[in-house]
C-alpha cells in the first residue's frame, strides 16, 4: 500500500487545513486560532478588495500575516469550497484521475474537481477509494496486534497501520478510540488475549538515527511475524521495576563455548530475512539500518540481518578469542551512530577468568561475568513499562587473525599501569591480572574530584597579598626582592674556568643532560664570563655619570671637591673615601661646607651634643638647604651677618632682626640697573596703542 509523505507535493501546502492555520509557518506572528470576528472581517475585506493583494488585507489584522489570511480564505472561508460528503461522481472521478496521474499529483487532480482541495482528494483515496483498503470487520487477531503494538509504539498510528496490511492509520486510530481502548481500560481485553496464544513479534527498523520506524511491507512478507522460534530468550517480569530489571541482567554464568554460541544464534530460525537479503542484494553496511524484533511480551530482540550474520561467522571462525569478554571495553562517550533510540547501555565487567591458550575449548574454566547498569540506562530500557534486551557486539580484534571489522562500539581495553607499594613489589604471588581485577569497581563507578571546586573560589586573603609583596626568603634566594636603583649590574670579565680553583657542585640541569646544545654566538660569548652579578661601584662612577649628563642633557656636573682648595689641605687621615654617593655630589657639597663653617663659629654652649637625636640634625640641615636654594650665592657676601643671625637662638622669644637697607634695595628693585630697566619698559608700553582686548597696565 503506497503512502504519501508530508513533503511530496510542495505546492499543496497553501491549501492544507489545520486547527491553528499556521503550523508550518515559521515567520508567523500569532499561532492562535482564528476568531469569529476575524473571519467576518476577512470575508468583508475580500468581498470589498478582492484576492489580489493579501498584504494589504493582512495590514488590517495586527497579528496576522498575508499567508495566514490567504490560507484561511482558501481552506476555510471560501464559499466555493465544498466540505460536504463525497458523491459517487466525485469518487469515480478521483479513481480515474489516480489511474491517469498516479498518487502524487494531488493538486493537479484537485483542479478537475470543483470545490475540492488536494488534501481532500488524497485522504478520500487513501481512506476509502484505494482497493487495497480493507472494509471488513475487525478480527480478534488484528485487535490483539493493535493492543500489543500500542504498548510499544504508543499513538504512532501510521507505524501501527503498517503492521496491518489493508488498514489505514485513520481506521486504526478510530478503532482504538472506539473499541479497544475501552476494553483495555476495563481489563476485559487483557484476559482474552492471554488465552494460550503465541506472542506477537513486531519487526522494526532504526533508520538514520531517527528512532524506531517500522519496516515497509513487501510482497510475500508482512511486518507481522507469527512463526518466531518456539523457545525465544525471555526475561521474567513480575513488576516493571528498575531493581528487577537490573537483577535480571546482573548475574549470568558463562556456559561452555558451544552453548554460548547457541544462545547468540537463537534468532536463526527466522528464515525470511536471509532470503530477503539474498533477493534484494546485500547493500553496504553503512546504508543497512538496524533491525530489531519487538516481542509483544516486552522484549527487544535483534533480528538476523547481514551485519549479525557476519558477526556470527567471525565468532565461528575463532570462538576462543571472541568469547574472551575480558578484552571488551565500552568507550565513555559513544558516538551518535552507535546509539539506539538515543540510549546506549554502558557496561562495565569485572572478570575473574584465567587466560588459557586458544583452540582449547575443553580446558576452559567457567567464570562469572557481572554487568552493571546505571540509572539512566534502566530508565530508558523500562520506558513505556517495557524492558529491552541489550545486544553485545564482539571486540575489534579476532584472536590476532584480524578477520573483518567488528562494530566500533567496543574497543580493546588499555593496559593500566599499577603503582605498587614496596611490599607489593617484593611479593611474587600477585599477578598483573589480579591487580587489574582489584582495580575494577564493584559498583557503578562515579568519578570523584580530588578537590573541591570551592577551593578555587574566594581563596584570596590579606595574608596571601602580604606574602606576595614580601615573600619569605629561602636558604638560597633566587633574586633580591627590591632592586636597588643605585646598584647597577656589571659583568665580571674573568672567565669561569679561572674564577674558582676549588671544586664547585655542578648544576643539576647540566650534569644530568649531556646532550650538546646549540646556543647562539651571543650566548657563547656571554657564557664565557658567567651570569650578571651586582659588583661594588668603581671609583670612576662619578666621571661616567658626568659624561652621560654632558652628552645627553647638556648639564655640566660640578663637584665642589675638585674646586675648593681647602679640602686638599686636610690631613690624609681625614680625607673622604674616593667612592662617593651620587646624591652627596649633586646636592650636599655646598651645604656641607656652610654647615661646618657655621658650626665652627657657634659657641660651645650652643653646639649640638653628640647624643642629640637624628631628627634635630636633619631639621638644621633642611633649613640651611632651603636658605641656599632660595637665595643666589651673589647675596651671600655678609658671612658675619649669617653667623650673627645664627647666634640669636639664645632667646627664643625675641623678635626677628629688621631687614637691612641693602637687602631691601636689591629685593624691591631699587638698584640703578633695575630702575633703568623699569623706565625702558614703561616707555615701551606707552608707545603701544591700547586695543579693546588688551588690559591696562597702571605703573605708579
UniProtKB/Swiss-Prot annotation:
Covalent link (Glycyl lysine isopeptide (Lys-Gly) (interchain with G-Cter in SUMO2)) residue numbers: 104, 194, 197, 275, 411, 447, 482, 499, 509, 523, 533, 546, 584, 596, 625, 639, 648
PROSITE patterns: HTH_MYB (PS51294)
Residue numbers bearing the Phosphothreonine modification: 266, 440, 444, 487, 494, 505, 520
Major localization listed first in the record, in broad terms: nucleus
Transmembrane feature ranges: none
Subcellular location: Nucleus
GO biological process assignments: cellular response to leukemia inhibitory factor; mitotic cell cycle; mitotic spindle assembly; positive regulation of transcription by RNA polymerase II
Motif (Bipartite nuclear localization signal): 564-584
Motif (Nuclear localization signal): 411-417
Residue numbers carrying Phosphoserine: 241, 282, 393, 577
One protein family per Pfam: Cmyb_C
Cellular component GO terms, alphabetical: cytosol; Myb complex; nucleoplasm; nucleus
Domain HTH myb-type residues, every copy: 26-77, 78-133, 134-184
Molecular-function GO terms, alphabetical: DNA-binding transcription activator activity, RNA polymerase II-specific; DNA-binding transcription factor activity, RNA polymerase II-specific; RNA polymerase II cis-regulatory region sequence-specific DNA binding; sequence-specific double-stranded DNA binding
Alphabetized UniProt keyword annotations: DNA-binding, Isopeptide bond, Nucleus, Phosphoprotein, Repeat, Transcription, Transcription regulation, Ubl conjugation
Mod. after translation: Phosphorylated by cyclin A/CDK2 during S-phase. Phosphorylation at Thr-520 is probably involved in transcriptional activity.
DNA-binding region(s) in UniProt: 54-77, 106-129, 157-180
Record field: compositional bias (Polar residues): 213-229
Lineage top rank: taxon: Eukaryota
SUPFAM superfamilies: Homeodomain-like
Region (Disordered): 212-287, 391-412
PANTHER family reported for this sequence: MYB PROTEIN-RELATED, MYB-LIKE DNA-BINDING PROTEIN BAS1
Biological function: Transcription factor involved in the regulation of cell survival, proliferation, and differentiation. Transactivates the expression of the CLU gene.
Assembly information from the UniProt record: Component of the DREAM complex (also named LINC complex) at least composed of E2F4, E2F5, LIN9, LIN37, LIN52, LIN54, MYBL1, MYBL2, RBL1, RBL2, RBBP4, TFDP1 and TFDP2. The complex exists in quiescent cells where it represses cell cycle-dependent genes. It dissociates in S phase when LIN9, LIN37, LIN52 and LIN54 form a subcomplex that binds to MYBL22. Interacts with CCNF (via the Cyclin N-terminal domain).
Protein name, entry field: Myb-related protein B
Organism per entry: Homo sapiens
Gene: MYBL2
Amino acid at each position: 500500500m503506497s503512502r504519501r509523505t508530508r513533503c511530496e507535493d510542495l505546492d499543496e501546502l497553501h491549501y492544507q487545513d489545520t486547527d491553528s492555520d499556521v503550523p508550518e509557518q515559521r515567520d508567523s506572528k500569532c499561532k492562535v486560532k482564528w476568531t469569529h470576528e476575524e473571519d467576518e472581517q476577512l470575508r468583508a475585506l475580500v468581498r470589498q478588495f478582492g484576492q489580489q493583494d493579501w498584504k494589504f488585507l493582512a495590514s488590517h489584522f495586527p497579528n496576522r500575516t498575508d499567508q495566514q489570511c490567504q490560507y484561511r480564505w482558501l481552506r476555510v472561508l471560501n464559499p466555493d469550497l465544498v466540505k460536504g460528503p463525497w458523491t459517487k461522481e466525485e469518487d469515480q472521478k478521483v479513481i480515474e484521475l489516480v489511474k491517469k496521474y498516479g498518487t502524487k499529483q494531488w493538486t493537479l487532480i484537485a483542479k478537475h474537481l470543483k470545490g475540492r482541495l488536494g488534501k481532500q482528494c488524497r485522504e478520500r483515496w487513501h481512506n476509502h477509494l484505494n482497493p487495497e483498503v480493507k472494509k471488513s470487520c475487525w478480527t480478534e487477531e488484528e485487535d490483539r496486534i493493535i493492543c500489543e503494538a500500542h504498548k510499544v509504539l504508543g499513538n504512532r498510528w501510521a507505524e501501527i497501520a503498517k503492521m496491518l496490511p489493508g488498514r489505514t492509520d485513520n481506521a486504526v486510530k478510530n478503532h482504538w478510540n472506539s473499541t479497544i481502548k475501552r476494553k483495555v481500560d476495563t481489563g476485559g481485553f487483557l484476559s482474552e488475549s492471554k488465552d494460550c496464544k503465541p506472542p506477537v513479534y513486531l519487526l522494526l527498523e532504526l533508520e538514520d538515527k531517527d528512532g524506531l520506524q517500522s519496516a515497509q511491507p513487501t510482497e510475500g512478507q508482512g511486518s507481522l511475524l507469527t512463526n518466531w522460534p518456539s523457545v525465544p530468550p525471555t526475561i521474567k517480569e513480575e513488576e516493571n521495576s528498575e531493581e528487577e530489571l537490573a537483577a535480571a541482567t546482573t548475574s549470568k554464568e558463562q556456559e561452555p563455548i558451544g552453548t554460548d554460541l547457541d544462545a547468540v544464534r537463537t534468532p536463526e530460525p527466522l528464515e525470511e530475512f536471509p532470503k530477503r537479503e539474498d533477493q534484494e542484494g546485500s547493500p553496504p553496511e553503512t546504508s543497512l539500518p538496524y533491525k530489531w524484533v519487538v516481542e509483544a511480551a516486552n522484549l527487544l530482540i535483534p533480528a538476523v540481518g547481514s551485519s549479525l550474520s557476519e558477526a556470527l561467522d567471525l565468532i565461528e571462525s575463532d570462538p576462543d578469542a571472541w568469547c574472551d569478554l575480558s578484552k571488551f571495553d565500552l568507550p565513555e562517550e559513544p558516538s551518535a551512530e552507535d546509539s539506539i533510540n538515543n540510549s546506549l547501555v554502558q557496561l562495565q565487567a569485572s572478570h575473574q577468568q584465567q587466560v588459557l591458550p586458544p583452540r582449547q575449548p575443553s580446558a576452559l574454566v567457567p567464570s562469572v561475568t557481572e554487568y552493571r547498569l546505571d540509572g539512566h540506562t534502566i530508565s530508558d530500557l523500562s520506558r513505556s513499562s517495557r524492558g529491552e534486551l541489550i545486544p553485545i557486539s564482539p571486540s575489534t580484534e579476532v584472536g590476532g587473525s584480524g578477520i573483518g571489522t567488528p562494530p566500533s562500539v567496543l574497543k580493546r581495553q588499555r593496559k593500566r599501569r599499577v603503582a605498587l607499594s614496596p611490599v607489593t613489589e617484593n611479593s611474587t604471588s600477585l599477578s598483573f591480572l589480579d591487580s587489574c581485577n582489584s582495580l575494577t569497581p564493584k559498583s557503578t563507578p562515579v568519578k570523584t574530584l580530588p578537590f573541591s571546586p570551592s577551593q578555587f573560589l574566594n581563596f584570596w586573603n590579606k595574608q596571601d597579598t602580604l606574602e606576595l609583596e614580601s615573600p619569605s626568603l629561602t636558604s638560597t634566594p633566587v633574586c633580591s626582592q627590591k632592586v636597588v636603583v643605585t646598584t647597577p649590574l656589571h659583568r665580571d670579565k674573568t672567565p669561569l674556568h679561572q674564577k674558582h680553583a676549588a671544586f664547585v657542585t655542578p648544576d643539576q640541569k647540566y650534569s644530568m643532560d649531556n646532550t650538546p646544545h646549540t646556543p647562539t654566538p651571543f650566548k657563547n660569548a656571554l657564557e664565557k664570563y658567567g651570569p650578571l652579578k651586582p659588583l661594588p661601584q668603581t671609583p670612576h662612577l662619578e666621571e661616567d655619570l658626568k659624561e652621560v649628563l654632558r652628552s645627553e642633557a647638556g648639564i655640566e656636573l660640578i663637584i665642589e671637591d675638585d674646586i675648593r682648595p681647602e679640602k686638599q689641605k686636610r690631613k690624609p687621615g681625614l680625607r673622604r673615601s674616593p667612592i662617593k654617593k651620587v646624591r652627596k655630589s649633586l646636592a650636599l657639597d655646598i651645604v656641607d661646607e656652610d654647615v661646618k663653617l657655621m658650626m665652627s663659629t657657634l659657641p660651645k654652649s650652643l653646639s649640638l651634643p653628640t647624643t642629640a637625636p637624628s631628627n634635630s640634625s636633619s631639621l638644621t640641615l633642611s633649613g640651611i638647604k632651603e636658605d641656599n636654594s632660595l637665595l643666589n650665592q651673589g647675596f651671600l657676601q655678609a658671612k658675619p651677618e649669617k653667623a650673627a643671625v645664627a647666634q640669636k637662638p639664645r632667646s627664643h622669644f625675641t623678635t626677628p632682626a629688621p631687614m637691612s637697607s641693602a637687602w631691601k634695595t636689591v629685593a624691591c628693585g631699587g638698584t640703578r640697573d633695575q630702575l633703568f630697566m623699569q623706565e625702558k619698559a614703561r616707555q615701551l608700553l606707552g608707545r603701544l596703542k591700547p586695543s579693546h582686548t588688551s588690559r591696562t597696565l597702571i605703573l605708579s
